[in-house]
Regions:
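Gly/Ser/Thr-rich phosphate-binding loop
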Residues: 2-3, 13-78, 82, 91
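Short catalytic/ligand-binding loop motif for oxyanion handling, primarily in non-cytosolic enzymes
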Residues: 10-12, 38-40, 62-65, 205-207, ...
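The DHp (HisKA) dimerization/phosphotransfer helix of two-component histidine kinases
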Residues: 8-11, 131
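Alpha-helix capping/helix-boundary segments
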Residues: 7-9, 36, 118
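Structural motif
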Residues: 5-7, 33, 212-214
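AMP-dependent adenylate-forming
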Residues: 52-55, 70-264
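Short intrinsically disordered, low-complexity coil segments enriched in acidic
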Residues: 1-6, 30, 112, 117
Length: 264
């Protein structure tokens, strides 16, 4: 069994490692911690088709994995991978901005978790604890503690959660609510783009896409990204870098990118 963050799996596919050697002994490949780009998943499935692949979701505050999706069908490179359904002994649902439980295909909301394994809260941070560990607003009959993850998702036609982005990764510009995660996913799905990050420069109101890949023409990446998102989500600028920075957890170092390209 292999349990990695998607960024680590992407390194293998970006460097075409399986052209030289393949871990044929692997039976299960699990990933969690960030969004898994489908084009990288497809690379792994192409070379190791007999493995079981599972996308796991579980914030630190839940102390365990709370939902999972076992890959059971084919996806196009531009598709989004579900994070599945709740594990045993817990429940996950989407809480809409109106305070209702999302139930229709395409409906969006914040991922909420309830169950016996929720953390007690944040050490010496009572205000932060009270903001996200709250009473279930859908249950007025008795006390029921929930954790509001701050992650946004939508329901697909199968009732599975499709991850969108963090709530703090959401911006409003020109009257539109924009999910930077969708822009990032669109850019990252482009062939020959190894990884991409969407940033918002609050000082200038501009959306930037930073990418690593072999496409030298940034206008080409800009146009392909724009073709995959609504007009109001079109990036203002695309920048190519030699190597995407990663933090100690193997995730894209957004703070470093913001500091370097947005002056944050």
């Amino acid at each position: 069994t292999l349990y990695w963050v998607p960024s680590a799996l992407a390194i293998v596919s970006n460097w075409n490692v399986f052209d030289f050697a393949r871990p044929e002994h692997l039976q299960k490949i699990l990933f969690a911690g960030e969004v898994m780009p489908v084009k990288h998943l497809n690379y792994w499935r192409r070379y190791l088709p007999d493995c079981l692949y599972a996308n796991l979701f579980g914030p630190t505050e839940t102390t365990d994995i709370c939902s999972f999706y076992v890959v059971d069908r084919n996806f196009a490179d531009s598709d989004s991978l579900p994070i599945g359904r709740a594990c045993n002994n817990c429940d996950t649902f989407l809480l809409t901005e109106e305070g209702t439980r999302a139930s229709r295909t395409g409906e969006e909301g914040e991922i909420v978790v309830r169950g016996s394994f929720l953390a007690d809260g944040y050490y010496n941070e009572p205000e932060k604890t009270a903001a996200v560990f709250t009473q279930n607003p859908l249950n007025t009959a008795f006390p029921e503690r929930i954790y509001r993850t701050g992650d946004l998702a939508r329901l697909n036609e199968k009732g599975e959660f499709i991850y969108i982005s963090r709530k703090d990764f959401q911006i409003k510009r020109m009257g539109y609510r924009i999910e930077l995660g969708e822009i990032e996913a669109a850019a990252g799905s482009i062939e020959k783009v190894k990884s991409a990050a969407a940033l918002y420069d609050a000082d200038t109101g501009r959306i930037l896409v930073i990418y690593e890949g072999s496409i030298k023409d940034t206008d080409e990446v800009l146009q392909q990204t724009a073709d995959k998102v609504p007009p109001y989500m079109r990036p203002d600028e695309v920048i190519r870098i030699k190597q995407m920075p990663y933090n100690a957890n193997g995730k894209i170092d957004r703070q470093r990118l913001l500091k370097e390209y947005c002056g944050a």
